[in-house]
A protein has these predicted regions:
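Polytopic transmembrane helical bundles with strong interfacial aromatic enrichment
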Residues: 1-227
Length: 227
């Protein structure tokens, strides 16, 4: 048993939620790797009949973990002075919210695909973005590239995460390109006023929110690179 050492950061000792919040977020992040693996595996093995149903089943579990983890994190940060209440514009808080927004959109748009075989290509893209956003979120948290009260490490792992992010995006694009004909059979939604149209509008709003948070969070990185 260790008898000497600095111990955990004082910010991590003040609340019992610290023992629950990070593992739940981790389970949510890991859970979003499963829809990505299921989808790519289904397309590569030519078993595309029920890829969206299988992906939706595991995405729901990941969404529950993310929702509880983010909620407990908000309650925890509210009790820590200087952390901006339940939520603040902090890089690590932002990047944990992005996959939640995308996953929420997918859980709605996947219903449209199952009912009327529409938004097929959109669901494929969403699954890839959900997983990629977890890698990007881990990069922001663990690399120290952005200053955050939630960042407690700074090491070389960031470069490996960027490689993983690049590989995941290339894999998504390549497999999608190889199966281009499959996506052409997707039906189009003519109006946003019906039930399925509202589901589409829901996805548009959630995706815009995720994009705005991504750009706002990542802008300091791009600004630093350009200058």
């Amino acid at each position: 048993r260790a008898t000497i050492g600095r111990g955990p950061n004082p910010l991590l000792q003040n609340h019992p939620l610290m023992a629950i919040h990070p593992p739940l977020l981790y389970m949510g992040y890991v859970g979003l790797a499963l829809p990505f693996a299921i989808t790519l595996g289904s397309f590569i093995n030519e078993t595309k009949e029920d890829w969206v149903s299988k992906s939706r089943s595991v995405a729901r579990v990941a969404w529950v973990f993310l929702t509880i983890g983010i909620s407990l994190g908000a309650a925890w940060s509210y009790e820590v002075l200087g952390w901006g209440g339940y939520w603040a514009w902090d890089p690590v808080e932002n990047v944990s919210f992005i996959p939640w927004l995308l996953c929420t959109g997918f859980l709605h748009s996947s219903i449209v695909q199952r009912k009327i075989n529409s938004l097929v290509n959109w669901n494929y893209v969403l699954i890839g973005l959900m997983f990629s956003s977890t890698i990007y979120g881990t990069f922001i948290t663990r690399s120290g590239v952005l200053i955050s009260v939630h960042s407690f490490s700074n090491g070389p792992i960031g470069q490996y995460l960027l490689v993983g992010l690049l590989i995941s995006l290339i894999s998504l694009l390549f497999v999608g390109w190889k199966n281009e004909g499959y996506f052409k059979n997707s039906k189009k939604i003519d109006s946003l006023s019906g039930k399925f149209g509202l589901f589409t509008l829901n996805n548009i709003l959630l995706s815009i929110a995720a994009f705005i948070i991504f750009i706002g969070t990542s802008y300091p990185i791009y600004f630093e690179v350009i200058n």
